[in-house]
């Protein structure tokens, strides 16, 4: 369920303050954040934000079409290592019956 319109988007206050401060100084550097639920605003465009995925910080370069999404959408938390490789590793299917 989406957030109520009367509440407005959630943006971490400290992160927004750091971004606006960097915009005023026209500075670009990587910002670390643990706030995956922060919605991306137009002020964030052009910055690289390192979003925590539970283990490391994943660098996310914010572009125009990311506005309105949340930071956590661009830092996957799970790694897919493949399914069990029983038959696929052997290179063939089961032998045919006669």
UniProtKB/Swiss-Prot annotation:
HAMAP family recorded: Ribosomal_uS19
InterPro entries, alphabetically? Ribosomal_uS19 (IPR002222), Ribosomal_uS19_bac-type (IPR005732), Ribosomal_uS19_CS (IPR020934), Ribosomal_uS19_SF (IPR023575)
Species of provenance: Chlorobium luteolum (strain DSM 273 / BCRC 81028 / 2530) (Pelodictyon luteolum)
Q: Which GO terms describe its molecular function?
A: rRNA binding; structural constituent of ribosome
State the similarity comment. Answer: Belongs to the universal ribosomal protein uS19 family.
Q: What SUPFAM superfamilies does the record tag this protein with?
A: Ribosomal protein S19
One of the GO BP terms on file: ribosomal small subunit assembly
Q: What does the function comment of this entry state? A: Protein S19 forms a complex with S13 that binds strongly to the 16S ribosomal RNA.
Q: Which GO terms describe its cellular component?
A: cytoplasm; small ribosomal subunit
Q: Per its UniProt record, what NCBIfam families does this chain match?
A: rpsS_bact
Tell me what gene encodes this.
rpsS
Q: Where is this region: Disordered?
A: 77-98
What PROSITE patterns does this protein's entry cite? RIBOSOMAL_S19
Name the Pfam families on file.
Ribosomal_S19
- Per its UniProt entry, which superkingdom is the organism in? Bacteria
Which keywords does this Swiss-Prot/TrEMBL entry list?
A: Ribonucleoprotein, Ribosomal protein, RNA-binding, rRNA-binding
Q: What is this protein called?
A: Small ribosomal subunit protein uS19
